[in-house]
From Swiss-Prot:
Gene Ontology biological process terms, A to Z: translation
Residues covered by region (Disordered): 216-275
Keyword Lipid biosynthesis attached: no
Function: Binds the lower part of the 30S subunit head. Binds mRNA in the 70S ribosome, positioning it for translation.
Annotated HAMAP family: Ribosomal_uS3_B
Positions with biased composition (Basic and acidic residues): 229-244
Lineage: Bacteria, Bacillati, Actinomycetota, Actinomycetes, Kitasatosporales
Single GO MF annotation: mRNA binding
Range of residues in the leader sequence: none
Protein's UniProt name: Small ribosomal subunit protein uS3
Length: 275
């Protein structure tokens, strides 16, 4: 099962998160159609920008688009001209106010989508598919990946009959749900037809899945501080100063005061009887 299914969908809610975050009832199909159009717009005209993924959040009158790219300078443009153009196109498409965020991918050598695009660009430039695959695998392993698998399918080398070949280095546990496996796909357009490139990159196991979910929730909430943080003073024991059981220790000294005076009165009574 793990060999066939998309690794992102297989681990959704465990180690990966939704790329589109919104809720709709009657407008569901319209929003899905808009999301497809937005992602198609981002990838069609900016192949050189190295866009890894596009995340979309929606409210009633606002759309937030996060673009993860390896070359943010190309997306921003000179003095932000390209970013303004993209924002204007998105507002025309959605009819709502668009908040555009451009985020840089820190390590593009271990991003599966960017690796697939790099291999596809080399195939379009008539580079040998074996050489392109091995070069990308070496770069990913040097960058810190624990395992990588690259598969190319199509008329490889201009052959009459299409076939698929893959190379693997390290471990790529596709059945392990706690494994952080990144997946990317891209098509190379060559003179012999299209060649599909699939990339799986294993980055290690996720030790605490609850922490990953908490980080994803914090990122969606805009990094808001959680309730009961370090700046909040801690409440006392049970009840505290609100009354009830918390005030019983304060009444104990008043109840013990008569017992302390009792020994002082006893000698006076004994002297009186002796006289």
């Amino acid at each position: 099962m793990g060999q066939k299914v998309n690794p992102h969908g297989f681990r959704l809610g465990i180690t990966t998160d939704f790329k589109s975050r919104w809720y709709a009832d009657k407008l569901y199909k319209d929003y899905v159609k808009e999301d497809v159009a937005i992602r198609r717009m981002m990838t069609s005209g900016m192949e050189r920008a190295g866009i890894s993924k596009v995340e979309i959040e929606r409210t009633r009158d606002r759309v937030r688009v996060d673009i993860h790219t390896a070359r943010p300078g190309i997306v921003i443009g000179r003095r932000g001209a390209e970013a303004d153009r993209i924002r204007g196109d998105l507002e025309k498409l959605t009819g709502k106010q668009v908040q555009l965020n451009i985020l840089e991918v820190k390590n593009p050598e271990t991003d599966a989508q960017l690796v697939a695009q790099a291999v596809a660009e080399q195939l379009s430039s008539r580079v040998s598919f074996r050489r392109a695959m091995r070069k990308s695998m070496q770069s990913a392993m040097k960058a810190g990946a624990k395992g990588i698998k690259i598969q190319c399918g199509g008329r490889l080398g201009g052959a009459e009959m299409s076939r698929s070949e893959f190379y693997r280095e390290g471990r790529v546990p596709l059945h392990t749900l706690r494994a952080n496996v990144d997946y990317g796909f891209f098509e190379a357009k060559t003179t012999f037809g299209r060649i599909g490139v699939k990339v799986w990159i294993y980055k290690g196991d996720v030790k605490n899945i609850a922490e990953v979910r908490a980080e994803n929730a914090a990122a969606r909430a805009g990094n808001r501080p959680a309730r009961g943080g370090a700046d909040r003073p801690a409440r006392g024991g049970r009840g505290g100063e609100r009354g009830g059981r918390g005030r019983k220790p304060q009444q104990a000294p008043a109840a013990e005061a008569p017992k302390a005076e009792a020994p002082a009165a006893a000698p006076a009574e004994s002297t009186g009887t002796e006289a």
